[in-house]
From Swiss-Prot:
Residues where Phosphotyrosine is found: 119
InterPro entries (UniProt xref): PRib_PP_synth_CS, Pribosyltran_N, PRibTrfase_dom, PRTase-like, Rib-P_diPkinase
Classification via Gene3D superfamilies: 3.40.50.2020
Positions bearing Phosphoserine: 123, 183, 332
Chain residues that bind Mg(2+): 242, 244, 253, 257
Chief location bin: cytoplasm
Keywords: ATP-binding, Cytoplasm, Kinase, Magnesium, Metal-binding, Nucleotide biosynthesis, Nucleotide-binding, Phosphoprotein, Transferase
Reactions catalysed: D-ribose 5-phosphate + ATP = 5-phospho-alpha-D-ribose 1-diphosphate + AMP + H(+)
Compartments, as annotated in UniProt: Cytoplasm
Family per record: Belongs to the ribose-phosphate pyrophosphokinase family.
Annotated protein name in UniProt: Ribose-phosphate pyrophosphokinase 5
GO cellular component, one term: cytoplasm
Length: 496
């Protein structure tokens, strides 16, 4: 194919990146009108023919995320309706990529299974089975058997009497109890509900838990939905960079090419960081360890890992402070103060093996003395694995949003003797007060790519503290190779 058959449209999320990608391809962005109607609906008009053309639509998932994504969907649909031969969505930062969920079928049924031997409860309502199977099952008594025992207990076998219709109040009560026993297995009793019987509170609670066993708390995660929306709009291909979750392409039924910022990051470390040979690559959490070790191995540098124990432990306390499933913590009479207690392990060789940082939420000193020693506390542990004393540390992460992770990691590294801390990030979203937090943190320099516009970052932190690395060369080369039917595997290791 010739490059004359290619058409590149750009959304309004990142016009600067669109221009740079087109400069690398030595073409001009195609003309498109982007706007909104008075009621806020997206309005798009294509100003160039796309019939039988290879169309690439560049739109990063930043800014007003929902508006930009809807704009992308309408652009894809418009190009497909205008007889484009192929439409590729180029999303340097794929929005909603941090919300992957379990894949589900097109009808909405989750593709999830549980080993049958792990089920320890009967289905409600129960599966119909023959009475012989119910009575012969070891360790189980059916409702019919209990009814049979109740009837036999009222019959005198030595002096048999004619069976009469029971009319006494006692017999009526017994029959009512039997009916209640039979109906209990089919009517769920919610603990604390209006139908709750105090005598059967334990059984009802067990029944309620059994019915909801295996039920996933319905926190909606839009991973599969985003993939289906792009496919339904008419996208034939997706190009993105440094996906937060590597399993995300599995949600698509169209090809997905996930590019990497690793070659550009390695090039920056080699040419822009003094004495990088003695630096340490640091992963701020266990999830990014594979990404960080890939750079460390390629540059033959040391590696360190910061492990966060997110599951808080409730220590022994009064009964009213016990946290159960679905419960809530009692309101503290005083604000909680976070105390950082660092412990440093040193060996005879002088190397620091594992440094632990304990974060304990306790009350202030004045309130602690007045409380009992067994008051409830939460303990959260952060461990640094690796030697960073007198070393330059480079924190490598794919995405920064609130910046809590990298700022806490930088503080821990400085506490453990690091001389300088760099933060090398692919996608800098920086929502809320993230930039203010970074400005007050121990991060000496922030290196970030331009998959998301960084004008506000440069304005707030200054050019002396921020370096923006350009990824348009990798994305442009990927578009050229895909358009010409060439392999893009070289871009994963060597870049453009």
């Amino acid at each position: 194919m010739s490059m004359s058959n290619i058409v590149v449209f750009g959304g309004d999320s990142h016009p600067e990146l669109v221009t740079k990608i087109c400069e690398n391809l030595d073409i001009h962005p195609s003309k498109v009108e982007l706007g909104k109607f008075s009621n806020g609906e997206t309005n798009i008009a294509l100003r160039e023919s796309v019939r039988e053309k290879d169309v690439y639509i560049i739109q990063s998932g930043c800014g007003q995320v929902n508006d930009t994504f809807m704009q992308l969907l309408i652009l894809i649909s418009a190009c497909k309706s205008a007889s484009a031969s192929r439409v590729t969505a180029v999303m340097p930062y794929l929005c909603y990529s941090r919300q992957p969920d379990i894949p589900y079928t097109a009808k909405g049924a989750p593709i999830i299974s549980k080993p049958k031997e792990n089920y320890t409860f009967e289905s409600h309502p129960g599966t119909p089975v023959s009475s012989s199977l119910m009575t012969q099952r070891p360790g189980a008594e059916s409702s019919l058997k209990s009814l049979d025992s109740a009837i036999r207990s009222t019959i005198n076998l030595e002096n048999p009497q004619p069976i009469r219709t029971p009319n006494s109040s006692a017999t009526a009560n017994n029959n009512f109890d039997i009916k209640k026993t039979l109906s209990f297995s089919r009517i769920p009793m919610i603990p604390g509900g209006k139908l709750q019987n105090t005598s059967n509170s334990t059984d009802a609670g067990e029944l309620f838990n059994a019915q909801n066993a295996g039920y996933k708390l319905w926190v909606v995660q839009a991973g599969t939905l985003i993939a289906h929306l792009l496919s339904a709009a008419g996208a034939d291909h997706v190009i993105t960079m440094d996906l937060h979750d590597p399993q995300f392409p599995g949600f698509f039924d169209i090809p997905v090419d996930n590019l990497y910022c690793k070659p550009i990051a390695q090039n920056y470390i080699q040419h822009r960081i003094p004495d990088y040979q003695d630096a340490v690559i640091v992963s701020p959490d266990a999830g990014g360890a594979k990404r960080a070790t890939a750079i460390a191995d390629a540059l033959e540098l040391s590696f360190a890992l910061i492990h966060k124990e997110r599951r808080s432990q409730l220590l022994k306390g009064p009964p009213d402070a016990t946290l159960t499933s679905g419960g809530s913590l009692p309101v503290s009479p005083r604000p909680l103060v976070t105390t950082l207690v660092s412990s440093q392990n040193t060996t005879s060789s002088g190397a620091t093996g594992v440094a632990a940082l304990e974060m304990k939420k306790t009350t202030s000193t004045s309130s602690t003395s007045s409380q009992s020693s067994n008051s409830s506390k939460f303990v959260q542990t952060t461990m640094l694995v690796g030697d960073v004393r007198n070393k330059v540390c480079i924190i490598v992460d794919d995405l920064v949003d609130t910046s809590y992770t990298i700022t806490r990691a930088a503080k821990l590294l400085k506490d453990q003797g690091s001389t300088k801390v760099y933060a090398l990030i692919t996608h800098g979203v920086f929502s809320g007060d993230a930039l203010e937090r970074i400005g007050q943190s121990s991060i000496d320099k922030l290196i970030i790519s331009n998959t998301v516009p960084q004008d506000r970052t440069l304005q707030y932190l200054g050019k002396d503290r921020v370096d923006v690395i350009d990824v348009s060369c990798i994305i442009g080369e990927a578009i050229r190779r895909i358009h010409n039917g060439e392999s893009i595997s070289m871009l994963f290791e060597h870049g453009w």
